[in-house]
Amino acid sequence: MFLNALVSPTPTPIPPSAPILPPRFYTDFTITFTPREDPEMPMPPWVDGIPPLLPYAIGRGYSVYAPDLGMMVENYTDYCVPIFWPNAYFPCIIFNYNHTAYLISPHINHYGPCCIYRTNWSPPHRDFMLQFEQYYNGSTWSMGVNRRVLKQLIDWWVLPQSSANLRDHPVFGGFGFARKPLPSGYRPFVSFWYEGDIGWAHQVFENFTDTGPKTHLLDDFQLPDICNTNLACDFRP
């Protein structure tokens, strides 16, 4: 189990079932990125979402998920997802609209103000974790020291690398969900970690909610004029 190198998983006689996302949700997040992928830098997930070695960068943001509208927005307020070339050290917004994913960003590294990230691309289905159910990898209590959201029982699913062309690491990344459900019965999405263009990224989700006004932020969304474009984004899958 890949988590064994970091923490001892809580014994679970029967693996938990894969979680289902709520009909809508809002969550704040922090994203930590390190360009290091040498043997001295352990793969995520990291305690408190922070790698044990320098260098690394920490950013903030929020996500709004509304699959009934065919929409999801991820606002990265400090730096973007580390898959863009030559680097992603710029703020960005990635959103799904009308089966297309767009990137809004400043005019940096040939991006901006808006480009098409992917076509035929929609928010993840609410039951997307069912396809990964077999990759349950253990549960932890002690991933958080200063991050309360990580100091609870979390179930982890670690995905194998789908393409040998990306990197020589044995895994692509993983998902962490809190065992304790929300009042609605849905389980909060706590963590997502993955391999970037170089290095690793680890997102930690806080203030996850499936009720309240923030879950309706996309109700009146309209495609920005700057995104009426055929310009494709330059990124590395």
What annotation goes with each model-predicted range?
Residues 1-71, 108-113, 119, 136-149, ...:
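N-terminal leader/targeting segments and the immediate start of mature chains
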Residues 22-24, 62-73, 89-101, 150-154, ...:
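Short, solvent-exposed coil/turn segments at beta-strand boundaries
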Residues 15-26, 125, 146, 150, ...:
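Alpha-helix initiation/capping motif
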Residues 127-152, 156, 204-215:
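Short acidic, Pro/Gly- and aromatic-enriched capping/linker segments at domain boundaries
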